Amino acid sequence: INREKAFLAPERIRIVTDYILTHFDKKTYRGDKTYTFSVLKNVSEVASASGRQQIDEIKQKQRVSGFNSIFAVSGVDAAKLYYAEFQRQMAEHPQRRLKIAVIYSYGANEEETDGILDEENTEDTSALDRNSRDFLDAAIRDYNEMFRTNYSADGDKFQNYYKDVSLRM
């Protein structure tokens, strides 16, 4: 069996995405359990601060219901397919809308001959092929619209986007 082909099959991606959207609230305890969490209020400023510039984090205690979630896939092609399917299904069912962001490394996550993965490269996007870069640009535009930010896949703005996503988790 060709596992990669099976994992990227459109029907499988549709079913997995539907399951996640249908069961997300239950699996992440939305509306079920609450806890107090210190929410970072100035995410964009903290994410954009350079190494020399120190920004004080502004946190506010807030009652939160449920948990955030990370959905990891095998590679860039899978990320593109799932992202598109999530967008399609959420457009059809707005009541199941989630806030989704995409982060991927562009070292292709391929194993070296010794079985050790290379370090993730979050410094620049120059190694991306045109299609992957265009996809990432579109996903970052969606993110900017969702959170009223102004990131891109260029240089420092990409590093700041990466930090912003991490801080919001």
Segments (PLM) and residue ranges:
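Conserved C-terminal RecA-like helicase domain
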Residues: E4-M169
